[in-house]
Amino acid sequence: LEASPLLLNSEIIELIGQGMWLFTGSDGNVRVETDINSFTEFSAVKPRGFSKNRVIRVIDSIGNDIKDIFESMYIGKVDNSEQGRNLFKKEVLQYFETMQNINAIQNFDPDSDVIVEQGDELDQVICDCYIQPVDSMEKLYMSVTLSI
């Protein structure tokens, strides 16, 4: 198998920097060069990790899954009291433990990474989550010391 057109390494780097998703050939195999999306405007608020599809899939899953948990088990069913919010927090903590066990997130601290509080209105719940997604190995920087 071959990827076409054949690109120089400098061209590959340039295209990836532009947010291009591309295929390259190596040892008769075609592979995705890197699992990125088109996001290229990095900042302190949205660093380079936001250009990585694996990271975005984790972030999207967290938002969707916690929304589903809240809607299916808590809306209209559980009081917005300290006890009710603690039940929800326990559910979120279990979810993140599972996410860490499947290597979707890392360095999760159940004592500090989830805060659930009442919002400004009686029916509002605020859930702040501090997570670190796991990404794939893609780059190797290696030093070799020769002894002659």
Predicted regions and their residues:
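Structured, hydrophobic secondary-structure cores that serve as assembly/anchoring elements
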Residues: 1-148
